[in-house]
Amino acid sequence: MLARALLLCAAVVCGAANPCCSHPCQNRGVCMSVGFDQYKCDCTRTGFYGENCTTPEFLTRIKLLLKPTPDTVHYILTHFKGVWNIVNKISFLRNMIMRYVLTSRSHLIESPPTYNVHYSYKSWEAFSNLSYYTRALPPVPDDCPTPMGVKGRKELPDSKEVVKKVLLRRKFIPDPQGTNLMFAFFAQHFTHQFFKTDIERGPAFTKGKNHGVDLSHVYGESLERQHNRRLFKDGKMKYQMINGEMYPPTVKDTQVEMIYPPHIPEHLKFAVGQEVFGLVPGLMMYATIWLREHNRVCDVLKQEHPEWGDEQLFQTSRLILIGETIKIVIEDYVQHLSGYHFKLKFDPELLFNQQFQYQNRIAAEFNTLYHWHPLLPDVFQIDGQEYNYQQFIYNNSVLLEHGVTQFVESFTRQIAGRVAGRRNLPAAVEKVSKASLDQSREMKYQSFNEYRKRFLLKPYESFEELTGEKEMAAELEALYGDIDAMELYPALLVEKPAPDAIFGETMVEAGAPFSLKGLMGNPICSPEYWKPSTFGGEVGFKIINTASIQSLICSNVKGCPFTSFSVQDAHLTKTVTINASSSHSGLDDINPTVLLKERSTEL
């Protein structure tokens, strides 16, 4: 009763019209207003009871006593390499642990989805309208006294000031995990099949109606775009040959809309599935590789099934590429990010006897969380030369000049930046970062600590606990005043990282559930789909089950250059700068009106 009285008192003192502004319901309890000044917490199936869902049930109490902290789990999984080498060789142990990883993470994501920016309560509209991003937490009610409910100041600090003071890079900080640019561009390329904000309607809306791994960034979101890029022969996509190698066709040859500045020559306006991928040659590199892979798989299937027509070859190849993508993401991409000695495994059969829903809805917070711009370097090093942002942006001639092989070799060697911790946001994306912060405010995100609680983490009690140091903590204290008013986006980038890790705790604990649910919730992972016949027989099934980032490169890049998602040598080779400005290139250097036309905050 005392806690309830204090929360209501705080709301009244602050002039709150909505008693749920104080976020009184804990442990995923649902707050429902009762009249104008009372609330009721629905604790159903939370494992807790009481007025604010704070008293654990008996079984919950036992689970809490036995459950190790995220820090402990991370330590165990990143140490004792000899033990994990043994575990990885014992199939039933590896399967048991992987099943637990998948279920424990994915069960943190509501399925079916619950809220969106306009519905802080469950509704048919929030469930059925696929044009919205869903929400992990409902938006802060409109009639609250502060932007975060009842905590913090009545106005948030100026977003430009936040970016400049606590996010903007002073000096490049390399990632201690050795993450490279092959990873950075893979992340950017992969996520743009489901992060497709509809800027014309607002940041809470998406054009990616499939809400998952559909490879629309390879094939196109609409049927018209897909058809314009297809050959309609042997299942293949249109292409052109340059210097004996396959590249995407041009905009002129496909009549596909792409975003390019007007001064770009027609022969350099490549047409791919995602209209924004002309922005960076690193994205066009991956677009080229996946184009080659699709057409290669079509050849394999054509040989296996000469009786099949164009449509079946195309559709089956697409399913195979979706499977390859999911396997690469889990076993190479997520494996690298985790730093675990335990080997992650893509095996849909692990979930066949579990309660699991094969559907997914992309959350706005997942989009915000994935703003990993600190990965970007100050310059791009390719074949002994350096390109600054002004030289790199919208410049497909760089890809043609050096070739895909040299791009792969160079990006594999170049280290990316550390995402969490100290200021490491490149100046070139300052405006993009500011837009991300502005849009999260427009969508009325709850505080960083509320998101920590949502993902079963202990809220931070001070800015110093958040950052792990005093100087940054003092800056944040001056900007926000209250740790419970700290915003999600900047907090993710200033949170103290785990030792020798790229991310802080919250990025991992919140990001992993979104990622794994989205990957394993794909229809191809369901019992009805996951069988050889779906993929053209054992030949197609084998392509998926043997996929890796290295095999993708070897099958489609001349010379089969070595690649991985981490640098093998932390000492970077010296390079020559060509026509490079001594200052960092900002967005003003690259025609921001074009860049900001669509989805700038996601690039």
Curated annotation (Swiss-Prot):
Additional remark text: The conversion of arachidonate to prostaglandin H2 is a 2 step reaction: a cyclooxygenase (COX) reaction which converts arachidonate to prostaglandin G2 (PGG2) and a peroxidase reaction in which PGG2 is reduced to prostaglandin H2 (PGH2). The cyclooxygenase reaction occurs in a hydrophobic channel in the core of the enzyme. The peroxidase reaction occurs at a heme-containing active site located near the protein surface. The nonsteroidal anti-inflammatory drugs (NSAIDs) binding site corresponds to the cyclooxygenase active site. Conversion of arachidonate to prostaglandin H2 is mediated by 2 different isozymes: the constitutive PTGS1 and the inducible PTGS2. PTGS1 is expressed constitutively and generally produces prostanoids acutely in response to hormonal stimuli to fine-tune physiological processes requiring instantaneous, continuous regulation (e.g. hemostasis). PTGS2 is inducible and typically produces prostanoids that mediate responses to physiological stresses such as infection and inflammation.
Catalytic activity as recorded in UniProt: (5Z,8Z,11Z,14Z)-eicosatetraenoate + AH2 + 2 O2 = prostaglandin H2 + A + H2O; (5Z,8Z,11Z,14Z)-eicosatetraenoate + 2 O2 = prostaglandin G2; prostaglandin G2 + AH2 = prostaglandin H2 + A + H2O; (5Z,8Z,11Z,14Z,17Z)-eicosapentaenoate + 2 O2 = prostaglandin G3
Pathway(s) the chain acts in: Lipid metabolism; prostaglandin biosynthesis
List of residues binding substrate: R105, Y340
Subcellular location: Microsome membrane; Endoplasmic reticulum membrane; Nucleus inner membrane; Nucleus outer membrane
A GO biological process held by the record: regulation of blood pressure
Active site: H192, Y370
Post-translational modification: S-nitrosylation by NOS2 (iNOS) activates enzyme activity. S-nitrosylation may take place on different Cys residues in addition to Cys-525.
Modified positions (S-nitrosocysteine) in chain numbering: C525
The protein, known as: Prostaglandin G/H synthase 2
SS bond list: C20-C31, C21-C144, C25-C41, C43-C53, C554-C560
UniProt remark on cofactor binding: Binds 1 heme b (iron(II)-protoporphyrin IX) group per subunit.
CDD domains the record matches: EGF_CA (cd00054), prostaglandin_endoperoxide_synthase (cd09816)
Annotated site (Aspirin-acetylated serine): S515
Molecular function as annotated in GO: heme binding; metal ion binding; oxidoreductase activity, acting on single donors with incorporation of molecular oxygen, incorporation of two atoms of oxygen; peroxidase activity; prostaglandin-endoperoxide synthase activity
Gene Ontology cellular component annotations, sorted alphabetically: cytoplasm; endoplasmic reticulum membrane; neuron projection; nuclear inner membrane; nuclear outer membrane
Naturally occurring in which organism (per UniProt): Ovis aries
N-terminal signal peptide: 1-16
Domain EGF-like per the UniProt entry, residue ranges: 17-54
